[in-house]
Amino acid sequence: MVKIEILGTGCAKCKRLFANAEQAVKDLKITAELVKVEDLGEIVSRGVMLPPALFIDGEVRAEGRIPGVNEIKAMLTERKQ
């Protein structure tokens, strides 16, 4: 199962990124654990300087921007290969 983490302070951009990730998972019909990480200490300890950030299986895939649903789907599909 893939683990998708959205690191951010709960701002509107963070919520939009979470919704995009959720939609990508639904569209691909895959099982995933979606996690919101809002603890500032955890965010900084992971090296994120510009939230929101998208981590897939522990790897940062986007930072400081909101990838669209199709881009996230491509990231998830690429991961499976």
Regions found by a protein language model. Name each.
Residues 58-81:
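Non-catalytic, surface beta->alpha helical segment in thiol-disulfide oxidoreductase systems
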Residues 16-19, 49, 67:
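Generic recognition of short, well-ordered alpha-helical segments
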Residues 47-55:
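Structural micro-motif
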Residues 1-23:
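Local sequence-structure signature of Cys/Sec-based thiol-disulfide redox active-site neighborhoods
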Residues 23-31:
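Short helix-loop-beta junction
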Residues 30-42:
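Thiol-based oxidoreductase modules, predominantly thioredoxin-like and allied folds used
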Residues 5, 55, 61:
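Conserved beta-strand segments that form the floor/walls of ligand-binding pockets within enzyme
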